[in-house]
A protein has these predicted regions:
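Residue-level signature of catalytic and energy-coupling elements of molecular machines
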Residues: 3, 19, 42, 55, ...
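A general structural signal for stabilizing positions within well-ordered secondary structure
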Residues: 13-16, 129, 146, 155
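Short glycine-rich hinge loops at helix-strand junctions in the catalytic core
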Residues: 46, 68, 116
């Protein structure tokens, strides 16, 4: 982020006069501890991870690469997606989606379901609510918005994404127990 002195008039148009930089601020948001291991766990089990964000797709792609998400270099600016067919092709082709609106998140979840994918979605903001409602499995972070927690099927109380492998293992254990019990009655 650069702060500068500018004598011209500021508006939506590009700057027309010389700007003199007076400060440079570097911002960084490090990858959370355990993220690489968590994504590796899912990759080894054939789980396809998609990253859907309202941020710049180039930035999101770089962060996804750093986190070890497979095919993170395949990104798209969601503002370029216009038709239902665009979304269907995009979920087949891309891993990272940037500049995504809340309604587009929902459309992307629906497009993945149209591909016969079982869709699990994590989210913590009001902007995630529509997509969380449509996902086959919705997971919210307790530290996020009340709205996301209310619509989610599962809330991570410690808001730690690295707990996801243990959540999946617990879910599989429950399903296996139900299947074993059901087979006794058949």
């Amino acid at each position: 982020l650069v702060f500068a002195e500018y004598d011209g008039k500021l508006g939506k148009a590009p700057l027309t006069q010389k700007a003199v930089p007076i400060a440079l601020i570097m911002l960084a948001n490090p990858i959370r501890k355990g993220a690489k291991e968590t994504f590796s766990y899912f990759a080894k089990r054939g789980v396809e991870v998609k990253v859907i964000s309202g941020d710049n797709p180039v930035t999101v792609s770089a962060i996804a690469k750093e986190a070890g998400i497979a095919h993170a270099e395949r990104y798209v600016d969601a503002s370029t997606l216009k038709t239902k067919d665009d979304y269907q092709k995009a979920v087949q082709r891309y891993t990272v989606f940037g500049r995504v609106t809340p309604s587009q998140k929902r459309i992307l979840v629906q497009a993945l379901k149209n591909e016969r994918k079982t869709v699990a979605m994590t989210g913590d903001g009001v902007n995630d609510v529509l997509a969380l409602k449509d996902a086959d499995c919705s997971i919210a972070m307790a530290s996020g918005s009340d709205a996301a927690s209310q619509v989610a099927q599962l809330v991570l109380l410690d808001s730690d994404f690295s707990r996801m492998p243990s959540v999946v293992m617990e879910g599989r254990r429950v399903v296996n127990n139900i299947e074993r019990t059901a087979s006794l009655y058949i």
